């Protein structure tokens, strides 16, 4: 009975409230433009948004390296840009760093 009384109030609050439009929402990488991936939102974990690939010095996840990825990403970071690698900078910390090939 109590829920029946609360329902009209809830509808009134929902209809009078402001709504938000999330631009760039996605489910998979293929829905994002070139140079982006579909990553978990930092603010609302149940939403994924198109996010730029990691630039030099930005945080990354060592197991996230394929673009486009066929499934749903579990992290809020995208893989690094093609000329960068996700390298460990300290215990548990990874950043996009220049790829040092043919150094010698």
UniProtKB/Swiss-Prot annotation:
Pfam families documented for this protein: Prokineticin
Disulphides: 26-38, 32-50, 37-78, 60-86, 80-96
GO BP annotation list: endothelial cell proliferation
Molecular function as annotated in GO: toxin activity
The UniProt record lists the keyword Oxidoreductase: no
Leader sequence segment: 1-19
GO CC annotations, alphabetized: extracellular region
Keywords attached to this entry: Disulfide bond, G-protein coupled receptor impairing toxin, Secreted, Signal, Toxin
InterPro entries from the UniProt entry: Prokineticin, Prokineticin_domain
Top-level taxon of origin: Eukaryota
Tissue/organ expression: Expressed by the venom gland.
UniProt keyword annotation of Cytoplasm present: no
Chief place where the protein resides: secreted
Subcellular location: Secreted
Function statement: Potent agonist for both PKR1/PROKR1 and PKR2/PROKR2. Potently contracts gastrointestinal (GI) smooth muscle.
Family assignment from sequence similarity: Belongs to the AVIT (prokineticin) family.
PANTHER family hit by this protein: PROKINETICIN, PROKINETICIN-2
Protein name (Swiss-Prot/TrEMBL): AVIToxin-VAR1
Organism: Varanus varius
């Amino acid at each position: 009975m109590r829920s029946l009384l609360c329902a009209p109030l809830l509808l009134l609050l929902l209809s009078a409230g402001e709504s938000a439009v999330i631009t760039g929402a996605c489910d998979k990488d293929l829905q994002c433009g070139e140079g982006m991936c579909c990553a978990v939102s930092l603010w609302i974990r149940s939403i994924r948004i198109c996010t730029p690939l990691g630039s030099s010095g930005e945080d990354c996840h060592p197991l996230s390296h394929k673009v486009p990825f066929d499934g749903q990403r579990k992290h809020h970071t995208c893989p690094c840009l093609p000329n960068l690698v996700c390298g460990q900078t300290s215990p548990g910390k990874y950043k996009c760093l220049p790829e040092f090939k043919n150094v010698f």
